[in-house]
Regions:
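Tubulin/FtsZ superfamily GTPase core signature
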Residues: 1-158
Length: 158
């Protein structure tokens, strides 16, 4: 039986930041020099994606958003992730564990995170969601979006 190299003995862990809030979380982890993890940023907003420190970036929903973001609409974020599900699956292939981080309440994070979680789990990865909720001052619409999206995500993660 051949011996495995050191890199083969560790779980392949990926952290995927979805939308603005998720990308901010990934940036903080990278700046804190978290090791042993691959970072990916996913966004519908081309400008925001350029600001990400993540070495792997996936722009989703170009046909729907033309790179201009989801405009706070989770249904656009969902459709964007569905449109580019193959790009997402390619980035997550062979992952042992996937952490999905997103801010709930906006468009891309709220809508795309459940789709990405479903892709990761269907590929056999242990799938964990880590999300933030909006502040009270952000309003009822964002709070309702966050509640609905968090419930959808809860059903797609382990």
């Amino acid at each position: 039986m051949p011996l495995r190299s050191d890199s083969e003995n560790f779980a392949l862990i990926r952290v995927i930041g979805v939308g603005g809030g998720g990308s901010n979380a990934v940036n903080r982890m990278i700046r804190a020099e978290l090791m042993g993890v691959e970072f990916i940023a996913v966004n519908t907003d081309a400008q925001a994606l350029l600001q990400s420190d993540a070495p792997n970036k996936i722009r989703i929903g170009d046909k729907i958003t033309r790179g201009l973001g989801a405009g706070g609409d989770p249904s656009i974020g969902q459709r964007a992730a569905e449109e580019d599900s193959e790009k997402i699956a390619d980035a997550l292939r062979d992952s042992d564990m996937v952490f999905i981080t997103a801010g709930m309440g906006g468009g891309t994070g709220s809508g795309a995170a459940p789709v990405i979680a479903e892709i990761a789990r269907d590929m056999g990865s242990l799938t964990i969601g880590v999300v933030t909720k909006p502040f009270t001052w952000e309003g009822a619409r964002r709070r309702l979006n966050a509640e609905k999206s968090a419930e959808l995500l809860r059903d797609k993660v382990d």
